[in-house]
């Protein structure tokens, strides 16, 4: 009988990078449309969506959520597509979160 020595090594797991999805203010997109997008794509309750919309309006941008890269990229694509279908220039962007 042959014995085989096995060596196990512990790999350090890297914490996956996280990305914020932000919406940017513009002079054309209606506040109601922004609230609708926040409810539809970011699953925000009406009052939370309204608060985020006001932050976008006042500060020029606001974070809608923090996700893995794939999920964040999907949300950005969905919002861009939905905005274009509705002839709105609403612009979502990704920003990497530094942990």
Regions found by a protein language model. Give the residues of each.
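Terminal domain-initiation and capping elements
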Residues: 1-99
């Amino acid at each position: 009988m042959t014995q085989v020595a096995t060596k196990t090594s512990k790999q350090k797991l890297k914490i996956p990078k996280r990305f914020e999805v932000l919406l940017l203010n513009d002079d054309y997109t209606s506040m109601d449309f922004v609230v609708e997008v926040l409810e539809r794509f970011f699953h925000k309750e009406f009052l939370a969506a309204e608060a985020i919309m006001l932050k976008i309006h006042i500060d020029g941008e606001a974070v809608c959520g923090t996700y893995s890269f794939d999920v964040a990229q999907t949300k950005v694509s969905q919002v861009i597509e939905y905005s274009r279908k509705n002839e709105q220039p609403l612009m979502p962007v990704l920003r990497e979160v530094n942990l």
